[in-house]
Structure formats: C-alpha cells, structure tokens
Design a protein with these regions (language model features):
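Short, cationic-aromatic polyanion-contact patches
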Residues: 3-6, 58-77
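Short helix-coil-helix linker/hinge
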Residues: 3-6, 19, 83
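Hydrophobic residues on short alpha-helical segments
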Residues: 7-14
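The C-terminal cap of the DNA-recognition helix in HTH/winged-HTH DNA-binding domains
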Residues: 16, 31, 48-49, 95
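Short, hydrophobic-biased segments on the C-terminal half of alpha helices
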Residues: 41-45
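A short, conserved structural fragment
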Residues: 48-58
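Amphipathic alpha-helical dimerization/coiled-coil segments
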Residues: 75-117
Length: 119
C-alpha cells in the first residue's frame, strides 16, 4: 500500500480532521491544495476504493489509521528492498545517517521493551 506525494497530502488532511463532512474536505482541499471539488472527489473515491478511507452519508473517515498505514509502508519497504531483514534495513539507514544519542536511546528502549514482551 503506497501513496503518491499528492495522495499523501490529501490523506494527511483527512487524518488530521476526521471525521469530517465531504463539504468540509472540499473546502480544506481548496485552501491547502488549491483543488477543485471534482479533483477532491476523484482522489477520495480512489482512496476509498483502496480501503484507506470511507465516505458514507457525506461523512469521511479513515478505515486505517495513519500509524497503521505507516507501519504497512515500512513493512513493504523492508520486504521489497531488504528481503524482509530489519537488521539490513537498520544497517543501511545508519550507514547514511548519523543517529543522535536520544535516537539511539529510543531505539535501545524499543528493543528492550520488545525483549520484555517475549518472556
């Protein structure tokens, strides 16, 4: 499951404002993206068909949270680009990016928390 750049901006509008009426969505898309009503409804239908959002009785809600969506995107990236190996992904990431001490501590805390759940 992947969103293009424009679809991602559109999805963010919904996630940040849901539940919202389709009329409110049209207004927000005009203000933030300069989209016409027809463009908003076209993209909404496309993302509803993909099971990300739902437009029922003029009320737009998400069928998957932003966090769930990001998790699925991360899993897809690791599976496709790193043959499902999280350590390979982390090694590639840290070879190109310097981690701060806070980030290292946060990652270590996540690992320690996961180890505690396994027992």
């Amino acid at each position: 499951m992947k969103l293009g750049n424009i679809e991602s901006k559109f999805a963010d509008i919904i996630w940040e404002n849901e539940p919202l009426s389709s009329r409110e969505l049209v207004q927000l898309c005009w203000e933030q993206l300069k989209w016409k009503k027809s463009t908003t409804y076209t993209v909404l239908k496309k993302l509803c068909d993909r099971g990300i959002f739902k437009n029922e009785d003029g009320i737009v809600i998400s069928m998957i949270s932003r966090e769930e969506f990001n998790t699925k995107q991360g899993e897809h990236l690791i599976n496709e680009s790193f043959k499902g190996s999280l350590p390979s992904f982390i090694a590639a990431f840290i070879s190109q990016n310097k981690l701060s001490e806070d980030e290292i501590e946060e990652i270590q805390s996540l690992i320690n928390s996961y180890k505690g759940k396994e027992k």
